[in-house]
């Protein structure tokens, strides 16, 4: 049986694979698993539910809320808000669980459901497996009368509490900095521009008018050409691009050059080391991070630990080691002292705070890391599980590694959220990386 949960919750085409009946069952099962510890104390459990603006979000939120209420959980719906906002509010309200309805950077027709436990923490694999198991075993009948949970619509102070948290986390004056913000017509629209303005920056917002259908449509962190052009047009100091649920942030310097998650981590790691905030002198990244990050950290005398791809695995390593900074090349940056998950707005504030503190432009700060040529090709496949078992693929990987020698690397991995297999190649020269990656991708496509 195929596992329902991927690397970032449950995702699928809304109303096709991710349906309201499925959301109802997920809500009931998650409520049963995640609130079991509160029952002996006689307290009614509470769940926080947020979403991004895509059209299917309201339908799925209603179904999830019904499922949780049917198991005796009071549901507080907080409306459109970033994923890290749900994580924060789950902790801030003292809730027993949180749910975010979003497919992040995926196209509008998709949607997803991700759960948080008490304290705003993402679930480990074994808890997700338990939720899946319970889905098939729960009886249709639940509590009756006073035992049924209530659904409370749109908590009026939720966004304000989250905005105050961001201001408290990065108490800095950004006066004199002009920033273009691409909100991806997503959840960032209701938070990021406001947070940056509150810190004193001059904000030029683009793709900031969600209408339920335009989320991620040729905008946001997966379409960086938009913000590159806007930064140059407005003569801004930088640009910050978010994804649909605002848990990631990529940047653009004043010359229109992209500053990716690896470079952002390098900037913040060096800053935190200078301020004695980089606990155990360690940065946590994933195997997808550019080799240039490792070299930059060696130069800065900072230890680099790597994990599997997915911010949940970065989080696990951060928590296990007691470290203070981690993230992904894609722009998921985690600062555990200020949040339990990646937070794009917090990342943007932290990056601008470093610019303000040093008086240096983003281009100069980003020069701390030299990005090695890297090519990533997403190959559509019918069966992700069979690719690495293919003798042809194994032979192609071995040949590629021999060609690259010690000046590059090869990484093949399945997407955790889509029917894709990712082929990544780094090399000393761009053309070599492109050639090797193209050859590998062709073999994967035929496997």
From Swiss-Prot:
Name of protein: Phosphoglucosamine mutase
UniProt catalytic activity: alpha-D-glucosamine 1-phosphate = D-glucosamine 6-phosphate
HAMAP family: GlmM_B (MF_01554_B)
Keyword Disulfide bond recorded: no
Disulfide pairings: none
Record keywords: Isomerase, Magnesium, Metal-binding, Phosphoprotein
Functional description taken from the UniProt entry: Catalyzes the conversion of glucosamine-6-phosphate to glucosamine-1-phosphate.
PTM sites of type Phosphoserine: 104
């Amino acid at each position: 049986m195929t596992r329902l949960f991927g690397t970032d919750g449950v995702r699928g085409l809304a109303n096709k694979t991710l349906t309201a009946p499925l959301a109802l069952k997920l809500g009931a099962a998650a409520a049963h698993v995640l609130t079991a510890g509160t029952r002996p104390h006689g307290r009614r459990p509470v769940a926080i539910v947020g979403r991004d603006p895509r059209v299917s979000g309201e339908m799925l939120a209603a179904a999830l809320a019904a499922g949780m209420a049917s198991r005796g959980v009071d549901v507080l719906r907080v409306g459109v808000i970033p994923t890290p906002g749900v994580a924060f509010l789950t902790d801030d309200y003292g809730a027993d669980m949180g749910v975010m309805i979003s497919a992040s950077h995926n196209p509008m027709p998709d949607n997803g459901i991700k759960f948080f436990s008490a304290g705003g923490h993402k679930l480990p694999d074994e808890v997700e497996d338990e939720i899946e198991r319970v889905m098939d075993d729960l009886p249709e009948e639940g509590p009756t009368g006073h035992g049924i949970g209530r659904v409370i619509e749109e908590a009026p102070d939720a966004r304000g509490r989250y905005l105050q948290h961001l201001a408290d986390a990065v108490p800095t004056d950004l006066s004199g900095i002009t920033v273009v913000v691409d909100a991806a017509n997503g959840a960032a629209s209701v938070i990021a521009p406001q947070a940056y303005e509150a810190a004193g920056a001059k904000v030029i917002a683009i793709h900031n008018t969600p209408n339920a259908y335009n989320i991620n449509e040729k905008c946001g962190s997966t379409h960086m050409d938009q913000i590159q052009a806007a930064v140059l047009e407005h003569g801004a100091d930088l640009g910050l691009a978010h994804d649909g649920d605002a848990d990631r942030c990529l940047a653009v310097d004043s010359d229109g050059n992209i500053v990716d998650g690896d470079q952002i981590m390098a900037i913040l790691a060096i800053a935190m080391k200078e301020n004695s905030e980089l606990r155990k002198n360690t940065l946590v990244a994933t195997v997808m991070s550019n080799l240039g990050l490792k070299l930059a950290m060696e130069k800065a005398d900072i230890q680099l630990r790597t994990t599997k791809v997915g911010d949940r695995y970065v989080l696990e390593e951060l928590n296990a080691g007691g470290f203070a900074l981690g993230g992904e090349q894609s722009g998921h940056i985690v600062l555990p002292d200020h949040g339990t998950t990646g937070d794009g707005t917090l990342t943007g504030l932290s990056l601008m705070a470093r610019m303000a503190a040093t008086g240096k432009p983003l281009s100069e700060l980003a020069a701390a890391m030299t990005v090695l040529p890297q090519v990533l090709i997403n190959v559509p496949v019918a069966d992700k599980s069979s690719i690495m078992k293919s003798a042809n693929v194994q032979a192609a990987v071995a040949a590629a590694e021999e060609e690259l020698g010690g000046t590059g690397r090869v990484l093949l991995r399945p997407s955790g959220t889509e029917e894709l297999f990712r082929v990544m190649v780094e090399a000393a020269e761009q053309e070599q990386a492109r050639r090797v990656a193209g050859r590998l991708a062709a073999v994967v496509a035929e496997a």
